[in-house]
Amino acid sequence: MSPTSFEPLALRAHRLFESRDLDETRERISRVMQPHALLPSGRMQGAAHMDFVRLGGLGIGTIAFGDAMRVQVDAVDGYYLLMFCLSGHAQVAAMGRRLGVDGQTGVLCAPGERFDAVLSADCEQFVLRIDAATVGSLTGNPRATLDPVLHISDAALAAWHQQLMLVARSPALLARANANPRVAAQLEHLLIDLLIEGHPPAAASMRHDPAPGFLLRAQEFVNAHYAQPLQLADIVVAANVPERTLRDAFLQFRGMSPMQYLRATRLEHARELLRRSQPERRIADVALDCGFTHLGRFAIAYREKFGESPSETVGVRR
């Protein structure tokens, strides 16, 4: 297939790494995506690279390996993975489907699902790492079921595609988003809103959350007691099921473990408090009030989730 006309010129200025070493390539990608397996068809000879930026909780990037490569993710962890090809092609197994992916057809893999892709040697991927909690808040369903097949040229997706190209091609826009977390958050929500508008969740998933009752009980318990020093055993007792059953259900229906859900809940509450807090209130106090006892880890987790530091959130509000 010939390369798509989608050329993300602005992203090229955000080169995360270049490497001919397989282990380094895997480790550098894992830092911004998640741990995964890379299986080259032979000895890796080409140069791999990744361009990557964050817009709030949305990650946008390109990945090329320079060689034919198989990428395996056991379970997409807490986000939706959207991928199509800028050049080359891929065969992807995801969401119970086998798909041919290129510049016109993309794949959207839900949290908790396995992702297995075989990429041609000339393949350069365009990837979006879309925070599952944000999709849940915008759709009203924390486990929204989105069709895994994405027809990039569909008229319904034209507004999303045009906005995505604008962001990826505009150095000035990316620079402004990097400098102003509020702009980044607005772009994040606009891109996700346009995607959902043009590629809506299945009607059944919008009407009914298929998660079992014990998982909903666990969520209600976490939402009511997130500020307390909860352990996994506390959530298991509230759900009244074995730990393995609860863990498997969270991974299947929420795309994350129970403790990851607890951390995400604490982070969401912390962000809301930081946005509404009085100027004299310390960030450390907000973190402690939301159940975080290690302030350094809180700051790292906050930036990973929202693409900005707690102090930057406070600065935008002021």
From Swiss-Prot:
UniProt GO molecular function: DNA-binding transcription factor activity; sequence-specific DNA binding
Feature: DNA-binding region: 233-254, 283-306
Keyword Transcription: yes
Claim: Transcription is one of the keywords in the record: yes
Family matches, as Gene3D superfamilies: Homeodomain-like
Deletion phenotype: Cells lacking this gene are unable to grow on anthranilate.
Highest taxon above the source species: Bacteria
SUPFAM superfamilies assigned: Homeodomain-like
SMART domains: HTH_ARAC (SM00342)
One record GO biological process: catabolic process
Signal peptide as annotated in the record: none
Keyword annotations of the record: Activator, Aromatic hydrocarbons catabolism, DNA-binding, Transcription, Transcription regulation
HTH araC/xylS-type domain ranges (all copies): 216-316
Function noted in UniProt: Involved in anthranilate degradation through activation of expression of the anthranilate 1,2-dioxygenase subunits.
NCBIfam families: ant_diox_reg_AndR
Name of the featured protein: Anthranilate 1,2-dioxygenase regulatory protein
Species annotation: Burkholderia cepacia (Pseudomonas cepacia)
Gene name of the record: andR
